[in-house]
Amino acid sequence: MDLHLSRPIVLRTNPGLISRRRARRHLIPERCLLCLSIFLVLVANHRAWGQSSQTLRIYLARHGETDWNVERRLQGGIDTALNSTGRKQAAKLAERLKGIRLDAVYSSTLSRSRDTAEIVRGDIPLKSLAGLSERRIGKFEGKKLDRTIDPATALEYPKRSRDPDDELDGGESLNQFYERVRTTIEFIRSQHSSGAILIVAHAITNQMILRAIFNLTLPQAISIRQANDELYLIELDAGNAPRLWKLITEAN
């Protein structure tokens, strides 16, 4: 199964331009490519991968599906396991990355992230870091985002979870969470000046990783929606702006 670059994810300077852009059907499935909101000059060629010894390529994945994902139940720091679909998604991720020489694989310490990474890694070293774990969301953990079942949570959580200083009654504020993730991604980057690594983390964690690398505002970062089976590629090299793509397969 060959990996292909999607059209680059365009980063614009005007926060008002945050939107989802529907890509051409022959490149992208029904999901829209995300248009982030800060300008980057995106110059890359799939054939040129690996030519620069100073380029660090970060493959950024989200863990496979869990039953709580299906139920729209808020997981946060609760340790939930992959379901059968999630394990199949992890196996497909391993297939997609087959042939890519990875130097290391990173996951959080939560089972859904770590088990996804275990399925993918083969004999590549796995490093599980608590700093990559999902945001702790206090009293909302375990509750459903369903207006018919729990209308209070469905109304309260979306608003409070976007407040940068709200610790959600025993959880982490977005500012605290961002600092945790930023420190962790800086540590990871300090270990790899070049080569290729895989990070398997969580929805909000990955938002904060992209925020740290691309210097996004908080509203820009939390507008990102990465599905359980979506894979991003970040390229970093000295003297150039970071570059971001969503990777697709011929099956898409």
Regions found by a protein language model. Name each.
Residues 53-55, 91-156:
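Phosphate-coordination/substrate-recognition cap region in phosphate-metabolizing enzymes
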Residues 5, 11-13, 19-34:
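Bacterial N-terminal signal peptides that target proteins for export
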Residues 48-56, 135-147, 190, 195, ...:
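Acidic, low-complexity terminal tails and accessory targeting/binding regions
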Residues 58, 188, 195-203:
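Generic beta-sheet signal
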Residues 65-116, 169-182:
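Loop-to-helix element that buttresses phosphate recognition and phosphoryl-transfer chemistry
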Residues 155-176:
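Short glycine/proline- and acidic residue-enriched helix-loop micro-motifs
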Residues 33-43:
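Bacterial N-terminal signal peptides
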Residues 108-110, 131, 181, 200-204:
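Short, well-ordered beta-to-alpha junction loops that form the rim of enzyme active sites
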